[in-house]
Regions:
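Acidic, divalent-metal-binding catalytic cores of TOPRIM
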Residues: 415-677
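Membrane-embedded alpha-helical bundles of multi-pass transporters/translocases
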Residues: 39-111
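Extended helical coiled-coil dimerization/tether regions that scaffold
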Residues: 207, 215-351, 376-381
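Conserved nucleotide-binding/hydrolysis micro-motifs of P-loop NTPases
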Residues: 12, 113-117, 144-149, 217-220, ...
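Switch/communication elements of ASCE P-loop NTPase nucleotide-binding domains
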Residues: 1-66, 303-304, 308-448, 452-453, ...
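Short glycine-/polar-rich loops that comprise or flank the Walker A/P-loop
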Residues: 103-107, 134-139, 206-210, 345-346, ...
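Short alpha-helical segments and helix-capping/turn motifs at coil-helix boundaries
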Residues: 6, 89-95, 122-127, 186-201, ...
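Glycine-rich phosphate-binding loops of NTPases
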Residues: 79-81, 86-102, 108-248, 437-441, ...
């Protein structure tokens, strides 16, 4: 039994669509046959930029599972939990005297059932029709008004067609917020089955246990000691470790010895003093109250050594301290249930943004470190921890860690902004694989290539896929000098033209604007290549570029190609006419757009001094660069990186910016137009 899906309807940033989170299955943190543990493959990831809605998922689970009680310390629903766009629509409806819908927040929890396993589903009995043997069960939770007529009358008095206007709709919004806040006592969380029948006397906390490890828990100088204390205390409670630690009888013996000494030394004198000042028969006895927890917390001190030198705890690295705090919380939770007991609950462990304080390498290895630590700490246990781990992050390194350690894109939920609302997209291998087959080389390439900046796609405002090394070197500089693009996170992913297609499905799922900058790769015959013939037209020409072929109706012919290709959020850019010629590479485009530019000429001369003199002549005629641009392309074929670095050096040391080739400029304009919407 496990949480399979979780839909949030009109809760905070989540509206009525694109609002479902998918979770990994119920295998939980279990040992394989070889005794190893792999948390990555059983971890659900919530990824996205800051303020996208990742924490909202945790807050919803926390309020649903842990907040449905009368305790003031428990998380409660408030007006701020309602989706603001939803409230605005309701205000407009009420302003037109339509009161059919009252403000509510809804959740749908899909519970997966493991066939053939001993799932104890007594808590789900009321949700299962008699004689029905389902693979999954849906629970509908609704936070709604109980006394609806009273609430409706209040709304009618404050917001109606006589009061509501375009000019005062903001005032009406605040009126509704006030009504909701004043009626929170009139709201109740109710549960329904798939047929809309209310299920009474049901508590979600009897079915689900949600344990949250919050971000940035390194708040004091003794956090590391507290983490170790927690681990040792948990291990001490386990029968496996009981004989190797201080037993209760040992501690009781110490308490008795202390009591005897205290009473012998002090109690008689104190009691004589009390008798002398009061008529009542009052005496006092000193009792020792030493416990294992008090010993660990207050008496035992940790000393840390590094290269035989003692290191104070407050000088220990914050990243490693944070990692140990997370591990200690996990172990503490795992020790909650004895090995012999059967846990009939769905156990959710939420880890919020664990990358806090961690350097990139530690983030990259985060999941493997968790694996190793838990495996060592639980190596003498036989228990299977029936838990699902949910991890939120805005670290591309942790995304890499999940994909590479788990070998899959499954259970990655991408959360992004969709206007003022959040948008959740659940990824999996079948959705991302170019042809739906996860065993083919293209998909294997994605999983391996994702470590080379591809995971930045999950956190970028836009992306540019480039053909080669020179573009990857120079485009970041061009972007940094663009006053619009330099305010956004534009990730540049180096990948050749053919392999750009591999990312097609993933890019469309993410829905960020993406430009693919590729070479037109015009086919030349042998004589044209040998004579360095310039291209002036693509009529009756073919290309060898697989990306262009794909978007050109599977045709290599350039005869009907008049403009760039666009497909949903993807646009493919390739070279067009530049100063009378059509370049066929990025380097040739740079030369044609800047044939008489001093910075470009200096870079050409530094890269290929003999060829430079041969082409421009004596005296120097810059026009020769333009008329021999393809020759330059051929001569630079083995020195593209050197040319790009020389050009970058010249631009940075002279604070110069060169003319962008037309197709690069068009690519930037496309990204800007999409980001402005």
């Amino acid at each position: 039994m496990y949480l399979k899906k979780f839909k949030l309807i009109n809760f905070r940033k989540f509206a009525e669509n694109e609002n479902e989170i998918e979770f990994t299955d119920s295998q939980g943190i279990k040992k394989a046959d070889d005794g190893s543990i792999n948390i990555a493959s059983t971890t659900t990831l919530l990824v996205g930029k800051n303020n996208s809605g990742k924490t909202t998922v945790f807050e919803a689970l926390d309020k649903l599972v842990n907040g449905n009680s009368d305790s003031n310390s428990k998380p409660k629903f408030t007006f701020d939990d309602f989706n603001y766009e939803y409230i605005k629509k309701l205000v407009e409806e009420y302003g037109n005297d339509k009161y059919d819908v009252l403000p509510s927040i809804e959740f749908v929890l899909t519970i997966g059932l493991d066939k053939g396993k001993d799932d104890l589903i007594v808590n789900l009995g009321h949700f299962i029709p008699i004689g029905y043997d389902p693979d999954e069960i849906k629970i509908f939770a609704k936070y709604e008004v109980v006394e609806s007529e009273i609430f409706k009358e209040q709304v009618k008095n404050e917001i109606n067609s006589e009061i509501y206007t375009e000019d005062n709709k903001i005032d009406c919004f605040y009126k509704l917020s006030k009504i909701i806040n004043e009626n929170l006592f009139n709201y109740k969380l109710k549960y329904y089955d798939e047929n809309g029948n209310e299920i009474k006397k049901f508590k979600l906390s009897n079915l689900i246990d949600f344990f949250k490890i919050q971000a940035n828990k390194v708040t004091t100088d003794d956090c590391l000691s507290a983490a170790f204390n927690s681990i040792i205390t948990a291990r001490n409670k386990s029968d496996k470790f009981y004989d190797t630690t201080l037993t209760e009888s040992h501690i009781e013996g110490i308490n008795k010895e202390l009591e005897d000494k205290f009473n012998t030394a002090h109690t008689n004198e104190i009691n004589r003093t009390l008798t002398s000042i009061t008529d009542n028969d009052i005496t006092v006895k000193l009792r020792a109250d030493l416990t294992f927890e008090k010993i660990i917390k207050n008496i035992v001190k940790y000393e840390y050594k590094e290269n035989n030198n003692f290191v104070p705890e407050n000088q220990f690295g914050l990243g490693y301290t944070n990692l140990m705090v997370i591990i200690s919380k996990l172990v503490e939770y795992m020790e909650k249930y004895p090995e012999s007991s059967f846990n009939s609950k769905i156990n959710l462990i939420g880890i919020e943004e664990p990358e806090t304080y961690m350097h990139p390498q530690l983030q990259e290895l985060f999941i493997s470190h968790i694996n190793e630590a838990i495996e060592i700490l639980l190596q003498q246990h036989e228990k299977n921890i029936n838990s699902q781990i949910i991890l939120s992050t805005h670290s591309s390194h942790i995304v890499n860690s999940k994909i590479h350690s788990g070998g899959t894109f499954n259970s990655i939920n991408y959360i992004s902004a969709n206007g003022t609302n959040a948008r959740a997209v659940s990824l999996n291998d079948n959705k991302i694989s170019p042809d739906g087959e996860t065993e083919k080389d293209d998909f294997k390439f994605i999983k391996k290539h994702v470590i080379f900046k591809a995971s930045d796609l999950f956190f970028a405002d836009a992306a540019i896929l480039v053909e080669g090394t020179a573009e990857n070197i120079l485009l970041p500089y061009f972007i940094s000098n663009d006053n619009t693009l330099n305010k956004k996170f534009i990730t540049i992913l180096p990948i050749n033209g053919a392999h750009a297609l591999v990312y097609n499905n993933l890019i469309k799922l993410l829905q960020i604007p993406v430009s693919i900058i590729t070479d037109i790769d015009v086919v030349r015959n042998d004589s044209e290549s040998e004579d360095f013939k310039q291209i002036t037209s693509i009529k009756d020409r073919d290309t060898t570029n697989e990306t262009i072929r794909y978007y050109n109706n599977n045709s290599y012919s350039l005869n009907d190609v008049t403009d760039y290709f666009e497909d949903e959020n993807i646009k493919v850019f390739f070279q067009k006419e530049e100063n009378g010629y059509i370049p066929t590479s990025f380097e040739e485009s740079i030369i044609l757009a800047n044939y008489d530019n001093e910075v470009v000429n200096s870079a050409l001369k530094s890269t290929k001094p003999r060829i430079y003199t041969e082409i421009v002549g004596e005296p120097v005629n810059y026009k020769n660069n333009k008329d021999n641009s393809y020759k330059w392309q051929c001569k630079l074929s083995d020195d593209k990186t050197k040319f790009a670095n020389e050009l970058l050096y010249e631009m940075m040391t002279t604070d110069s910016i060169i003319n962008l080739p037309n197709y690069i400029k068009d690519s930037f304009d496309y990204i800007k137009s999409k980001l402005e919407k």
